[in-house]
């Protein structure tokens, strides 16, 4: 299994082959990486230009956006993952990316920026365009979440602090991406009703994910106040469901593999929890008010937590590999890989740096040759023989 982990402290990343629990020889007691090397190096890289997000481009390149809104491209087929292209855009100075989305079929990538803008960059013949196109998002407020619709290229959703959910269309797609003269607003959400004290409920969206839907846009948002909200544009402008799943800020939101009926969330402490979106506990959240007494709210059923290995800090990087594994990393500098279904930890490695993002490299697993398989079987048979020949302990005579 091959992973690349972006590091906050160095501005680069670390990549390696990792051993899973079921692959550990019998004479060893804990999993460890086969090898770890520094990759995604950029000569000027520093904590001030650290990698925030990384994604694959046509399985050949890794595209990374950095804290200073610069973009780096690396060749994954090169043993050292060499730098192919790096661009710094004057137009984006002072902006921080909140997400990165690659459209490989149209040779383009889009970054959402915290300033309430989006940047479109072309990528042709292994080279990033020298200039990017800036799009001002409706609302004119800062954003913290910016998500692309997987089924409709050019459609995005965004939101932030006191900036409620909007779905917009930014560009048309043909052979190339063509920006619209003005951004078209497809949906603008309304806030939930006032709380039990008749006070306005604050808005602070941290993450957004599109849910597969045929006749409408369906989304789920996470908030700084520990809420999960589900929107259906056919249902109306207010959330179809509003759930209080925790009391801490939710900082990551991911589907559990290909299953969009379950999500994995992390907060700013050490929680990594898996919730169902279809099975609801009607009385799971309970609080008390001096004016109205007990307040009971429904919550998506908690299916379990990924806590083996002792998380001791906020988790910023979460990545699922197909329907098999989920990897996590954050402030405590440990990379942990879990079995997605059983939640058992299969690998834990100290990376020596705070982790921002995790990238699984698909298609890079080398198949074992017949000789390697035969050698492994011989080794296992040898260990079995040694175990069987070990003399039994004599019982003490009384």
UniProtKB/Swiss-Prot annotation:
Keywords: Nucleus, Ribosome biogenesis, rRNA processing. Residues 364-379 have a biased composition (Acidic residues). It is found in: Nucleus, Nucleolus. InterPro entries: WD40/YVTN_repeat-like_dom_sf, WD40_repeat_dom_sf, WDR74/Nsa1. GO terms for cellular component: nucleolus; preribosome, large subunit precursor. It comes from the Eukaryota. Residues 364-398 are annotated as: Disordered. One of its GO terms (biological process) is rRNA processing. Component of the pre-66S ribosomal particle. Belongs to the NSA1 family. Involved in the biogenesis of the 60S ribosomal subunit. This is Ribosome biogenesis protein NSA1. It comes from Meyerozyma guilliermondii (strain ATCC 6260 / CBS 566 / DSM 6381 / JCM 1539 / NBRC 10279 / NRRL Y-324) (Yeast). The gene is NSA1.
């Amino acid at each position: 299994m091959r992973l690349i982990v972006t590091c906050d402290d160095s501005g680069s990343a670390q990549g390696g082959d990792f051993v899973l629990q079921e692959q550990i020889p019998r004479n060893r007691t804990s999993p460890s990486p086969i090898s770890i090397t520094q990759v995604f190096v950029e000569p000027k890289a520093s904590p001030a230009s650290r990698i925030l997000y990384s994604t694959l481009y046509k399985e050949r390149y890794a595209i990374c956006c950095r804290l200073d809104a610069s973009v780096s491209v690396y060749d994954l087929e090169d043993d050292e993952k060499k730098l192919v292209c790096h661009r710094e855009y004057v137009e984006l100075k002072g902006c921080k990316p909140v997400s990165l989305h690659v459209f490989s079929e149209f040779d383009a990538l889009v970054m959402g920026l915290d300033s309430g803008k989006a940047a479109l960059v072309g990528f042709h013949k292994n080279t990033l365009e020298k200039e990017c196109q800036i799009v001002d998002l409706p609302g004119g407020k800062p954003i913290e979440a910016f998500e692309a619709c997987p089924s409709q290229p050019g459609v995005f959703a965004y939101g932030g602090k006191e900036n409620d959910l909007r779905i917009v269309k930014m560009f048309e797609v043909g052979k190339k991406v063509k920006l619209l003269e003005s951004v078209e607003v497809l949906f603008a959400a309304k806030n939930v009703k006032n709380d039990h004290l008749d006070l306005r409920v604050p808005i602070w969206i941290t993450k957004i994910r599109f849910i597969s839907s045929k006749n409408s846009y369906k989304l789920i948002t996470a908030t700084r106040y520990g809420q999960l909200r589900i929107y259906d544009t056919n249902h109306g402008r207010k959330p179809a469901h509003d759930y209080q799943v925790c009391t801490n800020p939710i900082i990551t939101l991911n589907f559990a593999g290909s299953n969009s009926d379950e999500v994995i969330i992390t907060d700013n402490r050490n929680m990594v929890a898996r919730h169902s979106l279809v099975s609801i506990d009607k009385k799971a959240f309970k609080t008390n008010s001096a004016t109205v007494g007990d307040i009971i709210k429904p919550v998506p059923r908690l299916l379990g937590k990924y806590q083996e290995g002792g998380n001791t800090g906020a988790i910023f990087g979460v990545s699922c590999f197909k329907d098999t594994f989920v990897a996590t990393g954050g402030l405590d500098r440990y990379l942990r890989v879990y079995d997605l279904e059983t939640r058992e930890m299969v690998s834990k490695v100290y990376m020596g740096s705070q982790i921002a993002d995790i990238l699984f490299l698909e298609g890079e697993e080398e198949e074992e040759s017949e000789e390697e398989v035969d050698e492994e079987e011989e080794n296992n048979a040898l260990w079995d023989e040694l175990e069987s020949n070990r003399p039994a302990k004599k019982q003490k005579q009384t």
